[in-house]
């Protein structure tokens, strides 16, 4: 493949953008990333005219692929032509909120913002105000946006900021615990329960190698929060309206969080975030309460129209059946390939998420119980050795994925996530043929 166009654009970008990009993950692979020109269904065409099967899908927002359905396109164009924004409330905000509240059981009220980061920042502030406490429990290695409260590393006894520019005092109010370890969570509650405002957790660790929860884990977190008067916050920025359909991952796992953060799909491909939950908490945001929250572009009419029409399309068409079936085909096909070529690796994912984690092991392949992606099943021959937390994913061959595997996939005409941690995403515009070609590319690249 010729990549001179991308190389040239990257050289230009380096002179005006830090690292040549506007989000760090986009800089992969080095020495230069692929620059997109336009999307086409489940594919992307780059600056040199190369066509790729695209499993990045904007890192999650594009459940319907790169082509907007006719009604979605019409709604967006209509809103833009009527004046893109007003600085005043509009009916489309109310309609979108009503749709979400009807379909997500735990959401009685919602506040729209502009990004997943903004949503989690606001959710943490809200939890602290509602409980009168300071500490937030998070999962080690998890990601909840570019915010000071959750950019931490270490463990409960030795926590530090994970980025330059964050005072140590911020980290002191955050307690990292391993995902899938209820005893570790219980221990920090026994030590700090009177000052824990909330537990903030992705129902599936989709930002850290798609780690699936063990049976009973979320129930344990729910019980701890109830026992100590803390709030349970589900970060569904990635899983929301993708895992578990319109009821989201909380519906799939039958868990009732107090607060949920949303992003990505809820905006139909446009910048968005949202904080939803019980009325007693959400109405504490200003102006009805004392927890300050505001934003010039919050509830942007174009974004609201795109998000609402996306969710309505999902409700009326076979979107979830289609993407989940292709996800199953990918995971099972990858399990067969990995068993033959790299049995120490782990196939992960659920619904329309998939990935291969380059785990190190003794070569024992995943069992039939986890052929459709690791489920932390005790019936699997690899139970207890597959990744159960972000730490396990970090211990995988992350460098080999970035240096060798992903560049080879690009040359095979397939775009997969930029690193070992981000998910791959199936869209409604992907086809069975895309799946077959992708599996063949994996055979070559592995």
Curated annotation (Swiss-Prot):
Entry keyword set: Cytoplasm, Isomerase, Porphyrin biosynthesis, Pyridoxal phosphate
Entry's Gene Ontology cellular component terms: cytoplasm
Gene Ontology MF terms in the entry: glutamate-1-semialdehyde 2,1-aminomutase activity; pyridoxal phosphate binding; transaminase activity
Keyword Cytoplasm included in the entry's annotation: yes
EC number: 5.4.3.8
NCBIfam families assigned: PRK00062.1
GO biological process: protoporphyrinogen IX biosynthetic process
InterPro entries cross-referenced by the UniProt entry: 4pyrrol_synth_GluAld_NH2Trfase, Aminotrans_3, Aminotrans_3_PPA_site, PyrdxlP-dep_Trfase, PyrdxlP-dep_Trfase_major, PyrdxlP-dep_Trfase_small
UniProt KW Isomerase keyword: yes
Compartment(s) where it occurs, according to its Swiss-Prot or TrEMBL record: Cytoplasm
Cited Pfam families: Aminotran_3
Co-factor(s): pyridoxal 5'-phosphate
HAMAP family recorded: HemL_aminotrans_3
EC class of the enzyme, as a word: isomerase
Residue list for modification N6-(pyridoxal phosphate)lysine: 264
The protein's name in its UniProt record: Glutamate-1-semialdehyde 2,1-aminomutase
Organism: Natronomonas pharaonis (strain ATCC 35678 / DSM 2160 / CIP 103997 / JCM 8858 / NBRC 14720 / NCIMB 2260 / Gabara) (Halobacterium pharaonis)
UniProt pathway annotation: Porphyrin-containing compound metabolism; protoporphyrin-IX biosynthesis; 5-aminolevulinate from L-glutamyl-tRNA(Glu): step 2/2
UniProt similarity note: Belongs to the class-III pyridoxal-phosphate-dependent aminotransferase family. HemL subfamily.
Source superkingdom: Archaea
Primary location recorded for the protein, binned into one broad class: cytoplasm
Gene name per UniProt: hemL
Catalysed conversion reaction: (S)-4-amino-5-oxopentanoate = 5-aminolevulinate
């Amino acid at each position: 493949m010729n990549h001179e166009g991308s190389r040239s654009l990257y050289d230009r970008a380096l002179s005006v953008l830090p690292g040549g990009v506007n989000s760090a993950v986009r800089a992969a692979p080095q020495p230069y990333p692929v620059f997109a020109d336009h999307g086409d269904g489940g594919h992307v065409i780059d600056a040199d005219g190369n066509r790729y099967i695209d499993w990045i899908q904007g890192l999650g927002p594009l459940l319907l692929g790169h082509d907007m359905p006719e009604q979605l396109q019409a709604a967006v164009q209509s809103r833009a032509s009527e004046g893109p924004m007003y600085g005043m409330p509009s009916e489309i905000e109310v309609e979108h909120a009503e749709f979400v509240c009807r379909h997500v059981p735990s959401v009685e009220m919602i506040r729209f913002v502009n990004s997943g980061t903004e949503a989690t920042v606001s959710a943490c502030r809200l939890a602290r105000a509602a409980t009168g406490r300071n500490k937030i429990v998070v999962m080690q290695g998890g990601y909840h946006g570019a915010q000071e409260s959750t950019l931490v590393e270490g463990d409960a006894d030795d926590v530090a900021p994970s980025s330059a520019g964050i005072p140590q005092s911020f980290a002191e109010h955050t307690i990292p615990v391993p995902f899938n370890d209820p005893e570790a969570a219980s221990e920090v509650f026994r030590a700090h329960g009177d000052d824990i405002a909330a537990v903030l957790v992705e129902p599936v660790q989709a930002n850290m190698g798609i780690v699936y929860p063990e049976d009973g884990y979320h129930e344990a977190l729910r019980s701890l929060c109830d026992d100590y008067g803390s709030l349970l916050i589900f970060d569904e920025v990635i899983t929301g309206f993708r895992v578990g359909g319109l009821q989201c991952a909380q519906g799939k796992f039958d868990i009732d969080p107090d607060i949920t953060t949303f992003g990505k799909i809820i905006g139909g491909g446009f910048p968005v975030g949202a904080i939803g939950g019980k009325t007693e908490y959400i109405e504490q945001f200003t102006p009805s309460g004392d927890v300050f929250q505001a934003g010039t572009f919050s509830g942007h009419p174009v974004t609201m129209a795109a998000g609402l029409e996306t969710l309505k399309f999902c409700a009326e068409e076979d979107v979830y059946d289609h993407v989940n079936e292709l996800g199953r085909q990918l995971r099972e096909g990858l399990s067969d390939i990995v068993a033959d070529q790299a049995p120490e690796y782990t196939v992960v994912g659920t619904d329309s998420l998939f990935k291969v984690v380059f785990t190190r092991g003794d070569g024992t392949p995943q069992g039939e119980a986890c052929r459709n992606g690791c489920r932390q099943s005790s019936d699997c021959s690899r139970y207890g050795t597959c990744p159960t937390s972000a730490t396990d994913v970090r211990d995988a061959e992350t460098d080999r994925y970035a240096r060798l595997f992903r560049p080879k996939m690009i040359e095979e005409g397939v775009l997969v996530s930029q690193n070992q941690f981000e998910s791959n995403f199936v869209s409604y515009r992907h086809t069975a043929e895309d799946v077959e070609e992708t599996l063949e590319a994996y055979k070559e690249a592995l």
